[in-house]
Swiss-Prot record:
Keyword annotations from UniProtKB, A to Z: Cobalamin biosynthesis, Glycosyltransferase, Transferase
Family that this chain belongs to: Belongs to the CobT family.
Organism: Escherichia coli O127:H6 (strain E2348/69 / EPEC)
Protein's recorded name: Nicotinate-nucleotide--dimethylbenzimidazole phosphoribosyltransferase
Subunit composition and interactions: Homodimer.
EC number: 2.4.2.21
InterPro entries in alphabetical order: Nict_dMeBzImd_PRibTrfase (IPR003200), Nict_dMeBzImd_PRibTrfase_bact (IPR017846), Nict_dMeBzImd_PRibTrfase_N (IPR023195), Nict_dMeBzImd_PRibTrfase_sf (IPR036087)
Domain of life: Bacteria
Length: 359
């Protein structure tokens, strides 16, 4: 799809000059150089994002939760009934799920998006981008056609860009779908080259005696569909799912506006791997929130070159980790914008040669 290809080619590069200015500013603040550690690095990363105009700040916050069912559920890779996807999506509209509670605490709006829930009628209160009533069973067929994947990517990119126009400067991603750690593991295995046995985990409390079947399902899906690890769209279409495509679309859409995206857990790592294959330029816009407790998490993050800020033993999904990390982003912005300067207090620290001290 040419429109998608054109958009991927217009993702702006990070501004190194803005990052250098931010580094000098931070080194001149009322503290020993580097003493705020990762907060300083995060503020500098944000300063380099063109959509923030060189000044780390947070405007409106949005978490986009992609909801979809998966045909591979039929292979016995999840213990929850498939209907739980629709039930939990409805609960999200009431604000009672984990991500909704944490997002409210963080001051973020949750956008619950139906990209493939298996119900006869659309669920009231959800944003309807449904492609089909669940993806194909990747153990016996592709998850979807390439055309379906590209259209959904473009739809979500456009939705994300519209939110940015309306003042959202910080995005988070989340998902909801029974059995969705199976296609996520297939994506991670395909792109990283690691064997499914090293990547597949228990998801939502799958009994350990059923894990061998889940590993076999992932291996069969990859063998049957032969996804091209160099082609992110191909991987998503063949062994992914509509929720994973949607998450990738948020990342691409936010990056196209020069804005940050907070990853969530294992599903978001898988989507990020595919999205980075489509456009490596998006990687500096991705901020890892927490280390998922899912087995393949470290493998995926290592391949992405990302180190998460939190380790809370969480594996809920939904965008819960992204919501939990939003205050960290705001803290990085706060130190940048609100701390005093060494020079104003006539403090000179050994080894500090920043321009701030000489101004």
């Amino acid at each position: 799809m040419q429109i998608l290809a054109d958009l991927l080619n217009t993702i702006p590069a990070i501004d190194p000059a803005a990052m250098s200015r931010a580094q000098r500013h931070i080194d001149g603040l009322l503290k020993p150089v580097g003493s705020l550690g990762k907060l300083e690095a995060l503020a500098i990363q944000l300063a380099g994002m063109p959509g923030l105009n060189g000044i780390p700040h947070v405007g409106k916050k949005a978490i986009l939760v992609m909801c979809a069912d998966h045909g591979v559920w039929e292979e016995g890779v999840a213990i929850s009934p498939k209907e739980v996807t629709a039930i939990q999506a409805e609960n999200m509209t009431r604000g009672t799920t984990g991500v909704c509670v944490l997002a409210a605490q963080a001051g973020a709006n949750v956008h619950v998006i139906d990209v493939g829930i298996d119900t006869a009628e659309p669920i009231p209160g959800l944003i309807n981008m449904r492609v089909a009533r669940g993806s194909g069973n990747i153990a016996s067929a592709p998850a979807m056609s390439r055309r379906q994947a590209e259209k959904l990517l473009l739809d979500v990119i456009c939705y994300t860009r519209e939110l940015a126009k309306n003042g959202v400067t910080l995005f988070g991603v989340g998902e909801l779908g029974m059995a969705n750690t199976t296609p996520a593991a297939a994506i991670v295995s395909t792109i990283t080259g690691w064997d499914p046995e090293e990547v597949v985990g228990i998801g939502a409390n799958l009994p350990t005696d059923k894990l061998a079947n889940k590993i076999d399902v992932v291996r069969r899906a990859i063998t049957l569909n032969q996804p091209n690890p160099q082609d992110g769209v191909d991987v998503l279409a063949k062994v992914g799912g509509f929720d994973l495509v949607g998450i990738a679309g948020v990342m691409l859409g936010a990056a196209s506006c020069g804005l940050p995206v907070l990853l969530d857990g294992f599903l978001s790592y898988a989507a990020a791997l595919a999205a980075c294959q489509m456009s490596p330029a998006i990687k500096p816009y991705l901020i890892p929130s927490h280390l998922s407790a899912e087995k393949g998490a470290r493998i995926a993050l290592s391949h992405l070159g990302l180190e998460p800020y939190l380790n809370m033993d969480m594996r809920l999904g939904e965008g819960s980790g992204a919501a939990l990390a939003m205050p960290i982003i705001e803290a990085a912005c706060a130190i940048y914008n609100n701390m005093g300067e060494l020079a104003a207090s006539n403090i000179v620290l050994p080894g500090n040669t920043t321009s701030d001290l000489n101004s």
